[in-house]
Structures are given as C-alpha cells and as structure tokens.
C-alpha cells in the first residue's frame, strides 16, 4: 500500500511536524510505504487561471502551462492508495502553501466534467481507477478544539481536496488547537498515529 503524505507545514519542527511524524509512523506500522511531499521545498507556482487544465478533459492528469514541480507531484498522487494531508490553520483556513497547492489540483487532478444540478464545469476527480482514502491533520495556535467550528475551514478544504481531486474518502480528521498556550497534548499525538494506521485498515475498492 502506498500512502502519500502532503505536508503543507513551512516549519520542520514543532507541533504539526510532530503530528505528521506520528501519522507517518502509524501508517508504516500498518505496513504502508509512506512518501512525503513537503510542499514548502517544492516549486509550486500560483495558479494563473489560463484554463489549460480546465479545457483538457481527456488526460489522466490535466495539462498545465506552468513548468514547475506540479506535474511530478500529481503523478505521485495518482499512484497513491491513500493520503495524509496536513496544514497549519491560518485565519481559519489552510495556509498559503496549502491553498496554492489546492488551487493547482482543482482541474489537474480533477476534471471539469462534473455537474451539480444544472451547473457544469464542477471539479470531479480524474483518479477513477480505485477508491482512495485520506486522513487530515490541522493545527491552530489560539482556537481551542471545543471551538473548532468557529475557525476550522482548513479541515473542510482538505476533505474537499480529497474528494474532488483525489477520489479519496476522508476516514478521519484531527484538529489540535490552543497550541500556543497549552502545547501539544499526548492524546493528539496518539490520535495522529491512529489516523495513520487506520489508512492501512481501510478496505480497497475498485
């Protein structure tokens, strides 16, 4: 089983880095091969809204006018069985690194063939060869977990990325909050490891 870890953390140490390590270890303990894509270290340009990917509805990965690392990244994602997606929360959303990546996936991993009611051009995943699975991790410095609904758009964004771009069902989420004041809790570390392990226990479906 191949798990791709999508890491939008700009820092290599700290609470989110610890949770990412725990989730990766959990997946490895379950027998998965884990490949980390550290987005901050890769060349990912802003979407230029040229619509090249939007118009390309036939390719396994939508063509892009930019020559950066995204095509290589998307090929790694296409080969995966499952994903660990992690971002710090910034102004309630995924951070700028995550959102740049999110936008670039919309019609490259996704296709414009989707439709909701009478609305056409809705993203739908190109990765239709098998059902994939995902878990998400978000960290926040100020907002406590019990007030998560007030600021955690990041988890919603990660779940949308999983479903619309990667054809992945999100089977678990973690939001670790109030880290600036109370630090990382042991229960969140355990939860992260459990999330990673849970990916290896999901039933593969064509």
Residue map of PLM features:
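N-terminal beta1-alpha1-beta2 submodule of the flavodoxin-like/Rossmannoid cofactor-binding fold
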Residues: 1-110, 177-206
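Short loop/turn motifs at secondary-structure junctions
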Residues: 33, 79, 130, 167-170
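Phenylalanine-focused residue identity feature
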Residues: 49, 98-102, 127, 133, ...
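Short, glycine-/small-residue-rich phosphate/pyrophosphate-handling segment
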Residues: 110-165
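Beta-strand-loop-alpha "switch" segments that mediate conformational coupling across diverse proteins
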Residues: 171-176
